[in-house]
Amino acid sequence: MKRLLLSLFILVTHFVYAQEVPDFPDMRSWMINSNDSDRYVFADTAYVRVTPDTKQAPLDTLFAGDNITVSDVTTNGLTIRGLKGPWLSINYIRNGVHKSGYIWQGLVSCKPMRRGDVKFVYGIERRADSIYRRGKNWDTIPRFLVKLKVIRNGTILAKATLTTYDDESANTSEGKVMSGMGLANVQNIVVLSFSGEACGIPTLDYYFAWTNNNQLVRLSNKMNVVDAGSLDHSETFTFPNEKNGKPDRIIWNMINEEASDKIDKHGEYIMEVTDKKTTTYIWDGVNGTISKSMQ
């Protein structure tokens, strides 16, 4: 009897807790939980509050690229620029003094990236839904506007934007900084990835070139979709410093595979190539531009 009562108590406790914790689906790409998480300030200017709301005057002011540590995610929500998100409890250092307070999650970066003293700070700026007509009706395609900022010693050197779908492909996001990959006048290639990390959900990769003269140039995108044992849509880039690479060329390769009626020795369907394409992009390192080859 005691064991039954204990089980019921645990179930009720979990149910009540689940009811109390609000869902913030707009914030899923940040991948922030209640564990300590090191992030940057994403907004150009962000106010730190003494409580998780805007009722009190700002406690402090932080700027894009400032380091913070998220210690907790509150249940208090706020909607700004069409994005609903929680207030975060944060710790940070200002002029050598350890401080704490609250900041709205939309002012905080997604995954932090840096190379040396240069920080690559990205986050979702606002909603960017598009409306289109289908027959007699108007439909909405939910989208996010994502902004990438390059910051050195507190100074924003460059900004660039992209729009990505607000669907299952935005369940997670990652960022990585690569070398210039052999492109002339390029310090780094920055890749922002949005994915659902599940079968049949696209992974969308957005590429940027960070040049030696501090330009942030949008390159092409690629998409990959895998549905195990059924289909495989693969897109890859070949850069100049990679095998089969060409000077100042980015080669896009696409292969579609689908399951055939044939079975291998492990009982799995054999995949067959159904489509294959290649496109070459020309990089102009002098002007910092990219164009599609007409050949």
List PLM regions with ranges.
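Short, solvent-exposed loop/turn segments at conserved positions within beta-propeller repeat blades
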Residues: R81-L83, N137-F144, C199-T203, M271-K276
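Surface-exposed loop/turn elements that mediate protein-protein interactions on large endomembrane-trafficking
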Residues: K147-E168, Y207-M223, T280-S291
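Short beta-strand elements that form the blades of beta-propeller/WD-repeat-like
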Residues: V118-P142, V186-C199, N244-N256
